[in-house]
Amino acid sequence: MANIIKAIRGMNDCSPTDSPLWQWIEDKVRNVLASYGYSEVRMPIVESTPLFARAIGEVTDVVSKEMYTFWDNDEQLTLRPEGTAGCVRAAIENGWIYNNEQRLWYMGPMFRHERPQKGRYRQFHQAGVEIFGIANPEIDAELIILTARLWKELGIEQHVSLQLNSIGSLAARAGYRTALVAFLENHQALMSDEEKERLLKNPLRILDTKNEALQEVLNDAPKLLDYLDDESRQHFTQLCALLDNMGVQYEINPKLVRGLDYYNKTVFEWVTSALGAQGTVCGGGRYDGLVEQLGGHATQGVGFAMGLERLVLLVQEVNKNISVPNAVDIYVVFSGEGTTLAAFQTAEKIRSELPHLRVMTHCSGGKFQKQFKRADKLGAKLALVIGESEVQTDRVVVKDLSGAVEQQTISVVELIDYLKRVF
């Protein structure tokens, strides 16, 4: 027997057993976004490498260590590590945002060369939202309120909390960076080699260190909120006031900076303690300079992305009462001369008249008992039984697989009305 080829480490399959929960979560996401009037866009998985270097920042961990990059003739290409840069590129290239507000969303796989662990994978999936052309803090609030609504839809609202910060303008961060570096230089003995490298290249990233000794020291470090420019401070104050009035609870986290260089003003994360180390389920913020940085007209931007794998894990962990639809509602079983055509015709009639129902026809033969076992395994609610006598009398036997209702025989003419009452 030949050696079995396995999936790449950190890139996982989604089984028929798992996919209904994924679909349920994705449908919830789509429905909430639709209720706010947002429009779906779809971008390529592969983009030009310089797009991410310019957008995310060359000294970030994502660009310097984690991207899957390859050469195609003389062009360097990268599997997208996140969605914002590609969405901004598409918006500029296709003229979606020229003198125009846009509220866009997307969903799909992203790729980062990280050490795989629970909740962190090399291929992972995100749902992202990007808003263009709106400067006011009201739209920041809408994004946060939208995500809060989604958590309720998923039944996880009691297990996530909102962390909020403002990182101000580029000029304000430059002043803060100088003060932070001056403070941290006295504590290099506590730092790993990686943290010392960050101190030189991207010192704000030290604020979210997992080094407990350094975390303790950072409690006395200068606070970014004390260095904000007046515009950023006013923006943040108005955002917090609106969230307060809308009843959205949050914690101001002065160490929250996010890991990508394009952010300014508002940054936020929804976090959970139910998933261990991988506690961030959604994160985002403003990026008012990114469109111009990538060659477009000056356009304000704000958005977020949520990890679908982490949402799946969180829903499985905390929402034990979830009711995910089965793959099959009705299983059509048949045996005997002339029953195949009748079974197929009956199944097609149901699909035409009741398209919301999932109908499967048994196609692998065998006795009725074997067919019923298959229907049970698939979680079907009803089995429709067609034998030779049913074909001759133009009837069908309806079997409730839960045993709650007695088996009964009804005419094919009455079948659709019967199913409407059941489903």
Curated annotation (Swiss-Prot):
Phosphoprotein found in the keyword field: no
Catalytic activities: tRNA(His) + L-histidine + ATP = L-histidyl-tRNA(His) + AMP + diphosphate + H(+)
One term under GO cellular component: cytoplasm
Any one Gene Ontology molecular-function term assigned to this protein's record: ATP binding
GO annotation terms (biological process): histidyl-tRNA aminoacylation
Domain of life: Bacteria
Bridged cysteine pairs (disulfide): none
Localisation: Cytoplasm
SUPFAM superfamilies hit by this protein: Class II aaRS ABD-related, Class II aaRS and biotin synthetases
InterPro entries reported in the protein's UniProt record: aa-tRNA-synth_II (IPR006195), aa-tRNA-synth_II/BPL/LPL (IPR045864), Anticodon-bd (IPR004154), Anticodon-bd_dom_sf (IPR036621), His-tRNA-ligase (IPR015807), HisRS-like_core (IPR041715), HisRS/HisZ (IPR004516), HisRS_anticodon (IPR033656)
EC number annotated for this UniProt entry: 6.1.1.21
UniProt keywords, alphabetically: Aminoacyl-tRNA synthetase, ATP-binding, Cytoplasm, Ligase, Nucleotide-binding, Protein biosynthesis
Assigned protein family: Belongs to the class-II aminoacyl-tRNA synthetase family.
Family annotation (NCBIfam families): hisS
Known partners and oligomeric status: Homodimer.
HAMAP family noted in UniProt: His_tRNA_synth (MF_00127)
UniProt-recorded name of the protein: Histidine--tRNA ligase
Underlying gene: hisS
